[in-house]
């Protein structure tokens, strides 16, 4: 991403949409806001487990890339993004060894198979939406060298709509990707969403 500002969706930053542990999680996430208006249910399938907060780095890359296109004046923003595994790993500050490519594919699988149901962004009372983070993805490997060459990922409608609505995006610190703990990442996202640049900070009870 270079000097490109990192962007993420406000709605996703403040709610528990992702597993905070790297080991496979199968137990669903059940969340309801204190006023009962906003709720989230996240479910995983046994084969792959739940999408993690580290997997979400791919969605941050997608949001940042689409936001750059938008800033450059592109009106018809694509829901399918094309890149190389190497460039994506470098952008989210990961290694580029063989294991890193395997973990990237595993992350794509979790993002595609994790199922979310939520009332967030509902336009009517008692309305809810169901989606996966990714609708589909491809990962191309050279037949002779077995080296990763290119890849695509297609965002779900819910994710895409949240990104192209520029007002729903917040800028994140470029060192966010260097945070190693799941709880650290979650706390940063919540604090960034609520405190932002307020001089008085934000009190969490």
Identify what each model region corresponds to:
Residues 1-205:
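Charged, alpha-helix-forming regions
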């Amino acid at each position: 991403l270079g000097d490109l500002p990192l962007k993420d969706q406000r709605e996703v930053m403040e709610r528990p949409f992702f597993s905070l542990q790297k080991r496979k999680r199968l137990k669903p996430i059940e969340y309801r806001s204190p006023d009962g208006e906003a709720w989230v249910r996240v479910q995983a399938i046994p084969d792959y487990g739940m999408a993690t907060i580290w997997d979400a780095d791919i969605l941050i890359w997608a949001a940042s890339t689409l936001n750059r296109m938008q800033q450059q004046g592109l009106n018809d923003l694509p829901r399918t993004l094309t890149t190389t595994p190497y460039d994506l790993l470098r952008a989210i500050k990961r290694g580029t060894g063989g294991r890193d490519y395997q973990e990237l594919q595993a992350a794509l699988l979790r993002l595609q198979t994790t199922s979310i149901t939520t009332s967030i962004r509902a336009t009517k009372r008692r309305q809810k939406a169901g989606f996966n983070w990714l609708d589909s993805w491809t990962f191309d490997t050279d037949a002779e060298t077995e080296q990763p060459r290119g890849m695509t990922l297609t965002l779900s409608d819910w994710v895409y709509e949240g990104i192209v609505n520029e007002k729903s995006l917040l800028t994140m610190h470029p060192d966010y990707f260097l945070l190693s703990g799941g709880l650290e990442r979650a706390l940063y996202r919540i604090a960034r969403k609520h405190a932002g640049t307020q001089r008085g900070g934000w009190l969490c009870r």
